[in-house]
Design a protein with these regions (language model features):
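A short, structured beta-strand/loop element
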Residues: 70-74
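Alpha-helical elements of the RecA-like P-loop NTPase motor core of helicases
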Residues: 20-21, 99, 135
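Vicinal oxygen chelate
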Residues: 2, 6-14, 78-150
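Class I S-adenosyl-L-methionine
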Residues: 24, 28, 99-102, 106
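Acetyl-CoA-dependent GNAT
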Residues: 75-79, 139-142
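Core segments of cupin and vicinal oxygen chelate
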Residues: 10-67
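N-terminal beta-strand motif that seeds the catalytic metal site of vicinal oxygen chelate
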Residues: 1-20, 31, 87-88, 143-150
């Protein structure tokens, strides 16, 4: 049995066009290169885009591990959406990568970019997409039993 992992995230945004250009740069930089479009109705059902179902969602897919389907993030348009304090964090391989990412985030159009107050203890960059969705890049260290320590 595999450890549980997330399959997908449905993230509501006020406007897909408001954030799409940002995620078109960010997600491929993470290696999430496959993109698709969909229509999500009021009941949350997903449909292919057609004359009856106009595009109101964009999805970015991570590469498959060859065993399970690829996970994805779907940005779904909801004009009444208010941003929340929820944050999605993506893991980097090392704290040195954070230094490389900071200017890239600015180039992509990220807002409110801040370094962790404790870059040694918790190396991370906090930022927002153009709609105010809170995101994070972190490079947590392996400690405790995972690192062979008591």
């Amino acid at each position: 049995m595999y450890p549980l992992r997330f399959d997908h995230i449905d993230l509501r945004v006020r406007s897909v066009p408001e954030v799409e250009a940002f995620y078109d740069l960010l997600m491929p930089a993470f290696g999430w290169v496959r993109k698709s479009y969909a229509h999500v109705d009021a009941e949350g059902e997903w449909h292919d885009v057609d004359a009856e179902h106009p595009c109101n969602a964009v999805e970015y897919f991570a590469p498959s591990d060859g065993v399970r389907p690829p996970c994805f993030i779907g940005f779904i348009e909801d004009a009444g959406m208010q941003t929340s304090r929820t944050r999605i964090a993506f893991a980097l391989g090392s704290p040195l990568e954070l230094i490389e990412w900071e200017p890239r985030l600015r180039e992509f159009g990220a807002r409110c970019i801040e370094r962790s107050e404790d870059m040694d203890g918790y190396p991370a960059l906090f930022f927002e997409d153009p709609a105010g969705t809170r995101l994070e890049l972190c490079a947590r260290k392996v400690t405790g039993p995972e690192a062979g320590q008591p």
